[in-house]
Every structure is written in structure tokens, then in C-alpha cells.
């Protein structure tokens, strides 16, 4: 009997335990739901507020980030509820703070650089912070209100925890495992949701699955946090790095861009008849013989045959693309500067509005004489190495989630370990011309001391080889004064410069701007009141470029080489340090998002009596093929992603880093998918116009992907080897050179990592010493 009672008691206890567990699970699910909603609200708030700070508005395409908020919120819910009330009371604000700090970092980075921080740039974080700390301080002070708003969820959470008796329940371990599966499930549900909405090139799904998408474009569609997750997956785990349709090279020809009118367009034909013409008068037709120009093609490259003879899929796709690519053609300006000298300048932060008739008259003269590219656009918003790479190689730099990281981040530094026979300097070396490269900062930065010689700039000098009054930024004039004697006595020369004086921020903290400020104010005279301090400081920084150009022209004239020397100069990127108010003040008008890319590329030669205007749309990658044509230097234009601006039988487009583009028919903004047409669209059906945009998007994607493949697969070496242009000895020598370059690069990475470590330790030691001293003083008192 007692045994039966004991069994019944045990059964009752089990039932109570089950009931208790069931209640705990139900309570836990309720707590999990609350934490989930809190994190979802925090992430949504931060995304919307950051988007407003970036673009000033939210449009439909920006809302795709909501597809991933459930997964992101569930991920953070995994770490909530681990403890009992007090522990969770501490954990929750910490988790919210982590989210808030992430968005604060993105906001500050955007305020400095004009774009969002990518995963591939993380390896450069320490170096960037070190070099830009003096700029960061001002941005942090100016952003204090916005940063406080970003931190508002954390502040509110802490406040409620202190003044309200709110319970912070935990939940069983089972409910910490469940959110892991829910996070994965919700993430894939978000992907499928985007897929249902649309998969074309303008869709969020395309941006998600296309690993060549840049950070800003991805964040514009998917949100900042989802972009970080997607980029981390691609970078650290290779997620999506395989072949897929969204990143396939597409062959698009000129025929695909023929806009056919939906309805016939009547043409008015005017006939002129002489009243007294007799019946016997012979009608004479004036026949204008059209000159047929040859394409810029190297007959040694048979890309169609190479495609047929390879079994490698990536190589076959590249060869097919190159075989079908429209070449540039020789034209009336071919050889205009044959035999001349070339000075090729990539100028830091240089923009059209740096050319001011009163402040920088030499720059203004050079801008409006020589060859004037009226529709030149600088493709890049920031990051010097990207604009520099495109300007010197006519390849697009990798700004995608494929991009490698490290201090040597970017295609230009990575090109040091690749075979680069089509760098600008290489062409002049092949023609027996001495080549030089000069930069007024350290050659280790962006690994220029490795990459420049590899694209043909054989004799390079950097900071250390030259002496400067200031380190950051240093003087362009001082660089010019120390460099010209190296080459000026040569019969022929090609000199490349990467300047530095124009670097921001454009405040009194800038050494170059500060030393030129009084001079610029005096030169502006009565117009001074029209400019705010930021605009004046920008002109003051560019005044150093003015001084360096004055010196350059004077020395060339003294040497009797001014008339047969071509000076090419453009900016590395838009001067992103300019705020909207500074930009408006400098331009004396408001500038649209696309207009800020409209810039100047000088092709100046004092020997030209009259300026030559070219109204074709063009950008950074188009300059190398244009120069090669002007100098009549043989090349295969299919291997360059730019087009000679004077090639009359070619399509001309200014493409931006985010795949926006402009030409004589349309301006397409990829950030909002808006197309502003310059033609009468009423005679075309909507389908034809839409097809035109999508074909251009496909072509631009292909140019970009082909450029990435050139670096990723070292494809120039593959082409030269399979075309029989290199001997076994030359191949072995190149492999040895590339391996040594990468060894040096790795050694430099270790040196800089060690320097960062020592710097950090020194800072921690100094802080500890200061704290100990303060404590000691407190005891003494």
C-alpha cells in the first residue's frame, strides 16, 4: 500500500515538473519574443536613421533591409536571457550598445570618407585611424548630436533599468538553441522573399547574390548590418564566391543599344531647285569619301582561337568576352603627340572647382586649353588607390565583397604580384622612353614601392628619398622641386606623379591649407565673402597644386621642352571631405548627386595653338587608351576596359564605381534606379527604354568583372603565355619576381602589425602610468 502511495507521489512530482517545465518554456518563449522585438526595433531605428543621414530620405528600394531584420534580431536574442534578472539586466544594454556602436562607426566613417566601411577594409583599420585621427577628431565633435541619437536605445534601456522595476527574465537552454535555427531559417526566408519580389539587375536579390556589388550599393538595398553579414560570409567563408549567373560575363554589342522608335518619325526633306536649270544640265552628286580607320588590335592575340582551345571555364569566358568586345579605332587625332614627353599626374582631391580664374589661374588656363574633355567624370567618390589604379591601367579596381583585405587593400597594391604588361609606363618603356614615378608620401603606403615599377614606372622616389616640411599632407611644390632634375635632361621622358597637398580635411588643422590661407583670401578679394571657411580652405589646399604647376611649366620652358611635353592631370576621386554646405559654397550653386562626379581631366600641351574640345562622355579608365592613341603607341584596345575618347565608331559612357552611368542619351543613377533621359522618349516604348538601361548595366558589370578577373586569375600572364609571347625563361623570371614581391609585402605587413602592437602597448602603459599617478596624487591629498 505504501509502495502504491509512493509511486503515485512520484507520478505527481513528474507531472508537476513537466507542468513547471512547460510553464518555464512558455514564459521563456514570451521573454524571447520580447527580446526579439526589442532588437528588431533597435536595428530598424538605426538603419532608418543612418539612411536619412546618408541620403536625406527613404525610398522604396531602401526598405528591402526589413527582410533581414527578423534574422538579425533573432541572432542577438540568442545571447539575451542567459541569466536571471540581474544578469539579463546588464546583458541587454550591452547587446544594444554593440548594435549602436556598429552604426556609430559606420556613420563616422561615412562622414569622413563619403561611403560606408567594408569588411575588406577592416585590415586597414589601424593604419586608417592613425593617418586620419586628426580629421576624425573634428568629425566626432561635429557629429556628437547624431551619435547621441544613435546611442539613444542604449541610453533609454539603461535609464529604464535604473528607474523602473522591470523584470528581465531568462529562459531554458533549449530556447537558446532554438533561436540559432530560427536565425538561419529567417535569413533564408528573407532571401526567398527578395527573390519573389524580383531578380533583375535592379533588384535587391541581384545585389545580394552578385558578389561584385560594392558596399554602398549593397547597403543601399539590403541595409548596413545585412551588408556586413553578406560581406563577412563572402570574405571569410567564401559564401557565394563560386560561379553564378549574376556575375557572368555578358557580351553586349552596339546593336543591343539601338533604340528603335515605337512609331515612325517623319522627316522633313527640303529640296532646292534652281529655277533656270535646263533639261540638259547634269546633276552632279558630291561624293564625300568616308575615311575608314583601323581598329587598335594586336594581331598576335586570337582570342576566339584561345577560347576554343581551353577547357578552363573562367578562361573561356574571358577569351570569349575579349573576342567579342568592341575595340577602339584610330582616328584623326592618332599620333597628334607622337614622340612627345608625358607628365601624368593623379592629383589628390582635385576637382573642376579647384580651377579658379582668380586663385589658381594656371590651373584655370590648363583646364580650358589643350584637349578639353567637356563630359569627363571621375568615377570614384573616395579611396585614392582606386582612382589611381583606373587612371594608370584602364582597369576597374575591385571594390566588391571579393576584395582582399590588409594594409595593402585594393587592386593597385595587389597588382604588384601580377603580370602587368599593360600598365601605362610599360608602353613607354617598350618604346625606349625612361619612366619615373614620384609621390610625396611613403612608398609603403598602398604598397606603391612594389606596384609602380610593375606597371612600368621604373625610377621611383617617395617620402624618405625626398624631404618635406610637413608629413601629412606634404607639399606638391616641394616634390616638384626635388623631382624634375631626375628627368628633365633626358631626350624623352615619361613621369608619373601622385600628389598629396589637396588632401582633406579642409580646416585650419590642414598644414597646406593653413599656410596658403592668407594668400588665397587676398586673391579672392571682393569675392571672399561668397565662400565659407571650408570652401576657402579647399582652394588653399589646391593652391599648392597651382604653385607646383607654375614651377613645372617654368622649368619645362627653361629646358626648351614645354611645347613638346603633354601634361595630363585629373583627381584621384571627388574631394569627399567637403560637406554639402562647403560644396555648395565652393561651386556657388547646389550640385546634384551625379554632378559631383563631373570633373576635369587636363590633357594640356602648350604647343597646341587652339583648344580641342571633346564632348564624348568618359571617365578615369578612358584616359590610358586616349593617351596611347594620341602618342600613336600600338596596343590592343580590347585588353583595356576604357575607350579612346576620339574613337568615332565606339560607344562612349562615363561609368561610376557603383555602376551608375552617363552618356549622350541618359543619366542613370543606380542608388535610386532613376533614369533622366536626354532624348524624346515619347517615340519609344517603355520596354525599349528599359532594355537599353539593362543592357548598359550588363555591359558595365562585364567590364568590372573582366577587370577583377585580370587580377584574380593573373590573366594577363595567361594570355601572354598561351599566345606564345613569353619564353620559359621569361615566365620563370616573372614568377620569381611576383613571389618575391609578395614576400616583401608579407614582411612589410608583419613590420606594420608589430609597430601597431608596440604603439598599442605604449598607449596602454602610458594610460596605466597616468592612472597610477592620479591615484597617488589623490592619496597624497
Set out the residue ranges of the language-model regions.
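Catalytic cores of glycan-processing enzymes that make or break glycosidic bonds
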Residues: 141, 244, 338
Amino acid at each position: 500500500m505504501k509502495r502504491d502511495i509512493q509511486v503515485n507521489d512520484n507520478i505527481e512530482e513528474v507531472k508537476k515538473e513537466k507542468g513547471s517545465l512547460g510553464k518555464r518554456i512558455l514564459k521563456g518563449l514570451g521573454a524571447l519574443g520580447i527580446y526579439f522585438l526589442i532588437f528588431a526595433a533597435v536595428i530598424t531605428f538605426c538603419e532608418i536613421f543612418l539612411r536619412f543621414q546618408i541620403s536625406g530620405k527613404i525610398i522604396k528600394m531602401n526598405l528591402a533591409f526589413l527582410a533581414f531584420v527578423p534574422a538579425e534580431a533573432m541572432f542577438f536574442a540568442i545571447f539575451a536571457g542567459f541569466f536571471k534578472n540581474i544578469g539579463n539586466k546588464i546583458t541587454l544594454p550591452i547587446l544594444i550598445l554593440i548594435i549602436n556602436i556598429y552604426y556609430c562607426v559606420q556613420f563616422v566613417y561615412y562622414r569622413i570618407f563619403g561611403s560606408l566601411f567594408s569588411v575588406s577594409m577592416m585590415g586597414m583599420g589601424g593604419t586608417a585611424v592613425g593617418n586620419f585621427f586628426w580629421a576624425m577628431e573634428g568629425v566626432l565633435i561635429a557629429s556628437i548630436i547624431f551619435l547621441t541619437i544613435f546611442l539613444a536605445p542604449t541610453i533609454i534601456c539603461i535609464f529604464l533599468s535604473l528607474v523602473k522595476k522591470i523584470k528581465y527574465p531568462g529562459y531554458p537552454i533549449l530556447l537558446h538553441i532554438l533561436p540559432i535555427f530560427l536565425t538561419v531559417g529567417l535569413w533564408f526566408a528573407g532571401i526567398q522573399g527578395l527573390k519573389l519580389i524580383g531578380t533583375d539587375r535592379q533588384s535587391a536579390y541581384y545585389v545580394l547574390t552578385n558578389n561584385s556589388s560594392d558596399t554602398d550599393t549593397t547597403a543601399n538595398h539590403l541595409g548596413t548590418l545585412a551588408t556586413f553579414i553578406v560581406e563577412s560570409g563572402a570574405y571569410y567563408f567564401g559564401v557565394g564566391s563560386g560561379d553564378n549567373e549574376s556575375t557572368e560575363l555578358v557580351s553586349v554589342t552596339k546593336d543591343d543599344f539601338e533604340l528603335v522608335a515605337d512609331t515612325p518619325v517623319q522627316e522633313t526633306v527640303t529640296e532646292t531647285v534652281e529655277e533656270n536649270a535646263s533639261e540638259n544640265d547634269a546633276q552632279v552628286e558630291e561624293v564625300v569619301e568616308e575615311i575608314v580607320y583601323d581598329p587598335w588590335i594586336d594581331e598576335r592575340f586570337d582570342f576566339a582561337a584561345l577560347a576554343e582551345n581551353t577547357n578552363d571555364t573562367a578562361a573561356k569566358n574571358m577569351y570569349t568576352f575579349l573576342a567579342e568586345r568592341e575595340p577602339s579605332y584610330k582616328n584623326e587625332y592618332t599620333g597628334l603627340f607622337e614622340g612627345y614627353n608625358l607628365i601624368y599626374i593623379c592629383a589628390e582631391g582635385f576637382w573642376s572647382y579647384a580651377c579658379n580664374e582668380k586663385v589658381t589661374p594656371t590651373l584655370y588656363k590648363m583646364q580650358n586649353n589643350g584637349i578639353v574633355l567637356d563630359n569627363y567624370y571621375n568615377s570614384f567618390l573616395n579611396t585614392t588607390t582606386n582612382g589611381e589604379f583606373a587612371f594608370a591601367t584602364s582597369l576597374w579596381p575591385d571594390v566588391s565583397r571579393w576584395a582582399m583585405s590588409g594594409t595593402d587593400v585594393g587592386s593597385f597594391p595587389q597588382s604588384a604580384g601580377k603580370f602587368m604588361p599593360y600598365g601605362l609606363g610599360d608602353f613607354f618603356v617598350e618604346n625606349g622612353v625612361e619612366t619615373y614615378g614620384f609621390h610625396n608620401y611613403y612608398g609603403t603606403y598602398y604598397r606603391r614601392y612594389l606596384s609602380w615599377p610593375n606597371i612600368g614606372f621604373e625610377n621611383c622616389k617617395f617620402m624618405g628619398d625626398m624631404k618635406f616640411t610637413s608629413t601629412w599632407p606634404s607639399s606638391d611644390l616641394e616634390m616638384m622641386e626635388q623631382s624634375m632634375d631626375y628627368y628633365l635632361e633626358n631626350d624623352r621622358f615619361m613621369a608619373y606623379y601622385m600628389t598629396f597637398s589637396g588632401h582633406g580635411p579642409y580646416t585650419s588643422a590642414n598644414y597646406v591649407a593653413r599656410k596658403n590661407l592668407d594668400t588665397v583670401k587676398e586673391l579672392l578679394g571682393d569675392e571672399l565673402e561668397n565662400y565659407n571657411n571650408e570652401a576657402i580652405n579647399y582652394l588653399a589646399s589646391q593652391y599648392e597644386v597651382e604653385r607646383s604647376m607654375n614651377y613645372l611649366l617654368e622649368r619645362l620652358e627653361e629646358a626648351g621642352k614645354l611645347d613638346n611635353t603633354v601634361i595630363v592631370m585629373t583627381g584621384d576621386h571627388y574631394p569627399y571631405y567637403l560637406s554639402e554646405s562647403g560644396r555648395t559654397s565652393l561651386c556657388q550653386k547646389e550640385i546634384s548627386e551625379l554632378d559631383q562626379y563631373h570633373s576635369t581631366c587636363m590633357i594640356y600641351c602648350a604647343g597646341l595653338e587652339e583648344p580641342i574640345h571633346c564632348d564624348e562622355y568618359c571617365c578615369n579608365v578612358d584616359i590610358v587608351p586616349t593617351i596611347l592613341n594620341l602618342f600613336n603607341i600600338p596596343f590592343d584596345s580590347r585588353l583595356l576596359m576604357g575607350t579612346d575618347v576620339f574613337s568615332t565608331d565606339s560607344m562612349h559612357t562615363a561609368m561610376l564605381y557603383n555602376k551608375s552611368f552617363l552618356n549622350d542619351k541618359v543619366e542613370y543613377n543606380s542608388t535610386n534606379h532613376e533614369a533622366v533621359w536626354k532624348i524624346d522618349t515619347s517615340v519609344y516604348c517603355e520596354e525599349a527604354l528599359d532594355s537599353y538601361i539593362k543592357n548598359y548595366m550588363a555591359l558595365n558589370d562585364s567590364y568590372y568583372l573582366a577587370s577583377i578577373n585580370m587580377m584574380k586569375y593573373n590573366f594577363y600572364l595567361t594570355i601572354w603565355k598561351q599566345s606564345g609571347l613569353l619564353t620559359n625563361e621569361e615566365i620563370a623570371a616573372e614568377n620569381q619576381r611576383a613571389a618575391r614581391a609578395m614576400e616583401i609585402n608579407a614582411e612589410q605587413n608583419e613590420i606594420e602589425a608589430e609597430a601597431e602592437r608596440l604603439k598599442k602597448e605604449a598607449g596602454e602603459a602610458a594610460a596605466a602610468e597616468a592612472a597610477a599617478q592620479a591615484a597617488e596624487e589623490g592619496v597624497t591629498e
